[in-house]
């Protein structure tokens, strides 16, 4: 009897007992049966998968076509199963425990192979993405380097000569040089790609020849290759870790370099300020030296004048007392004479003024007489 017959017997017997069981027991029975059905469904799917691997597709299609029967035959078969169930027959066809264990082990091996294959694909995708990220980092560094070179070689030189023909020519020359450099890199990469394709064709032809000769790889070779692949993967992982550490060290080095650059920039600013201050101090020192020289010259002149005055003072001799008295008396007489002549001058001026007044009166009277006197007398 097949599994369908056993299921029909169980369902019929359960259907007869359903009228006698309470609702709580029925719910528990339904839950237990649903759990058992899920386990049986999983087991059936595993068996079908294994059966689909073993049986060819054409034979499987014919077997499925043989299953198609009419509704009448199906009803007769169902009634026959019920009668057999009522008769107490409980023959079921199924797999033994050893066969089930073999199927489970085979399914476990297939699952492990799938996991290994998925892991290899994931590692390959991870390496591919890491290569893309590394290529992007290299490209970004190249772009930053190109920008830095452009700013250093072009922008700083043409910023002082805006609008000039020389600046435009320099920019065009820089663009032409960059295009020529990219063309050279493209040619090199094309040649490298062609050589790699040739090597790939050679390796494929060698592998094809080995397969034709019968030197194809066996299980032992595959195991050896798996071991070598695992070793290479460990080496690649170690190198990737080392690369990550180097990248971290490079990042730290860049941070330290930026810090030292900032310190150098500040030191250069301080150096420029100190240079300016030194120039100002030198100018002030030059002025002070000039003033010092002028003060030395003035001091030398004052010293010479002082020596001269001291010499004159040393050579000075005071006159005698009688001579001084005589000179003083003579000076007093001269002052008296001067005062006397000053009085005489004042008297003469006053008499001159009187004479002028009298002269003016006489002159005016004479003019009046000439005006009054008639002509001809």
UniProtKB/Swiss-Prot annotation:
* Entry keywords, A to Z: Cell projection, Cilium biogenesis/degradation, Coiled coil, Cytoplasm, Cytoskeleton
Any one of the GO BP annotations: cilium assembly
The terms describing its cellular component in GO are: centriolar satellite; ciliary basal body; cytoplasm; protein-containing complex
The superkingdom listed in its UniProt entry is Eukaryota
Its chief place of residence is cytoplasm
Query: Where found, per UniProt?
Result: Cytoplasm, Cytoskeleton, Microtubule organizing center, Centrosome, Centriolar satellite; Cell projection, Cilium
Q: Where along the sequence do coiled-coil regions lie?
A: 95-139, 169-355
InterPro entries recorded:
CC_domain-Cilium_Assoc (IPR051885), CCDC113/CCDC96_CC (IPR025254)
Subunit and partners: Forms a complex with CFAP184; the interaction is required for functional activity in cilia. Interacts with HAP1 and PCM1.
The family note in this entry says: Belongs to the CFAP263 family.
According to its UniProt entry, the function of this protein is described as: Component of centriolar satellites contributing to primary cilium formation. In complex with CFAP263, acts as a regulator of ciliary beating that connects radial spoke 3 (RS3) to the inner dynein arm (IDA) and the nexin-dynein regulatory complex (N-DRC). The complex is positioned parallel to N-DRC and forms a connection between the arch at the base of RS3, the IDA tail and N-DRC.
The protein depicted here goes by the name Cilia- and flagella-associated protein 263
Q: Which organism is it from?
A: Mus musculus
Encoding gene (name): Cfap263
């Amino acid at each position: 009897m097949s599994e369908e017959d056993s299921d029909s017997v169980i369902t019929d017997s359960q259907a007869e007992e359903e009228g006698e069981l309470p609702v709580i027991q029925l719910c528990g029975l339904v839950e237990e049966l649903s759990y058992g059905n899920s386990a049986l469904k999983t087991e059936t799917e595993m068996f079908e998968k294994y059966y689909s691997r073993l049986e060819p597709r054409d034979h499987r299609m014919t077997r499925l076509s043989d299953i198609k029967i009419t509704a009448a035959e199906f009803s007769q078969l169902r009634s026959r199963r019920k009668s057999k169930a009522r008769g107490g027959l409980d023959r079921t066809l199924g797999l033994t425990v050893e066969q089930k264990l073999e199927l489970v082990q085979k399914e476990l091996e297939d699952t492990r192979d799938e996991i290994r294959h998925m892991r290899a694909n994931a590692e390959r995708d991870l390496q591919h993405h890491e290569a893309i990220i590394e290529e992007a980092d290299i490209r970004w560094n190249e772009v930053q380097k190109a920008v830095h070179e452009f700013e250093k070689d072009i922008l700083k030189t043409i910023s002082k000569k805006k609008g000039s023909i020389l600046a435009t020519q320099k920019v065009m020359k820089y663009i032409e040089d960059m295009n020529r450099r990219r063309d050279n890199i493209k040619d090199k990469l094309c040649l490298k790609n062609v050589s790699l394709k040739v090597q790939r064709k050679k390796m494929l032809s060698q592998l094809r020849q080995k397969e034709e000769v019968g030197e194809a790889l066996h299980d032992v070779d595959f195991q050896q290759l798996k071991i070598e692949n695992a070793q290479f993967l460990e080496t690649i992982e170690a190198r990737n870790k080392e690369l990550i550490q180097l990248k971290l060290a490079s990042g730290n080095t860049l941070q330290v370099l930026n810090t030292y650059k900032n310190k150098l920039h500040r030191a250069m600013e301080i150096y420029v300020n100190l240079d300016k201050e030194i120039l100002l101090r030198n100018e002030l020192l030059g002025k002070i030296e000039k003033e010092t020289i002028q003060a030395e010259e003035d001091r030398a002149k004052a010293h010479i004048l002082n020596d001269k005055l001291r010499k004159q003072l040393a050579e000075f001799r005071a006159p005698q007392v009688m001579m001084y008295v005589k000179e003083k008396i003579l000076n007093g007489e001269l002052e008296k004479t001067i005062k006397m002549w000053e009085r005489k001058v004042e008297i003469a001026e006053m008499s001159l003024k009187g004479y002028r007044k009298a002269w003016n009166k006489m002159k005016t009277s004479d003019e009046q007489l000439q005006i009054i006197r008639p002509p001809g007398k």
